[in-house]
Amino acid sequence: MAYPMQLGFQDATSPIMEELLHFHDHTLMIVFLISSLVLYVISLMLTTKLTHTSTMDAQEVETIWTILPAIILILIALPSLRILYMMDEINNPSLTVKTMGHQWYWSYEYTDYEDLSFDSYMIPTSELKPGELRLLEVDNRVVLPMEMTIRMLISSEDVLHSWAVPSLGLKTDAIPGRLNQTTLMSARPGLYYGQCSEICGSNHSFMPIVLELVPLKYFEKWSASML
């Protein structure tokens, strides 16, 4: 859950988000080292009085600044590709949920059940109870079992939307006429909030997403009560 004046990411709840945080730290360190080197070279150029006017080329230096960036790009690309393959890999999901974006709400359908579907609208500020979050609460939460692989099928009925839950490392476009998929797995129970992340009209800011991850036995009770 985000909090005011937050500068970093939300706490990771899924293996994918943990990998993304590690990759962010890895890349940030490389950027920091490059920036330090460039700043050091610029400071030397501004402060030194030495010149070498007779030198027309330097093969050694040109070789270094050709090979070194290539090595740096490889160090960034390899872990990035690894995470991309992890995000695309979906093997034998325990549950499949179909998500449809509308102007301006979400609808969900549990495809493993015969008649389990509902719409999820934002609760207006005037109807919030004490302790509830403004612009983030919904009338129907998406209840899912924790520690299980869940496949989300995401599309749209009208315009472009984007289904995003930052703490789980999820952000998938909802495109009319196209079915995208992503996978999620939560390591612990809790409420996880997200919002539509693609400008989709006047009420774009009023399309929250709330996932409630619970142990399997509580999910079974909830699904039985909804049928």
Curated annotation (Swiss-Prot):
Mg(2+) binds at E198. The chain crosses the membrane at residues 15-45, 60-87. SUPFAM superfamilies: Cupredoxins, Cytochrome c oxidase subunit II-like, transmembrane region. Keywords: Copper, Electron transport, Magnesium, Membrane, Metal-binding, Mitochondrion, Mitochondrion inner membrane, Phosphoprotein, Respiratory chain, Translocase, Transmembrane, Transmembrane helix, Transport. Its EC number is 7.1.1.9. Component of the cytochrome c oxidase, the last enzyme in the mitochondrial electron transport chain which drives oxidative phosphorylation. The respiratory chain contains 3 multisubunit complexes succinate dehydrogenase (complex II, CII), ubiquinol-cytochrome c oxidoreductase (cytochrome b-c1 complex, complex III, CIII) and cytochrome c oxidase (complex IV, CIV), that cooperate to transfer electrons derived from NADH and succinate to molecular oxygen, creating an electrochemical gradient over the inner membrane that drives transmembrane transport and the ATP synthase. This is Cytochrome c oxidase subunit 2. It comes from Gazella spekei (Speke's gazelle).
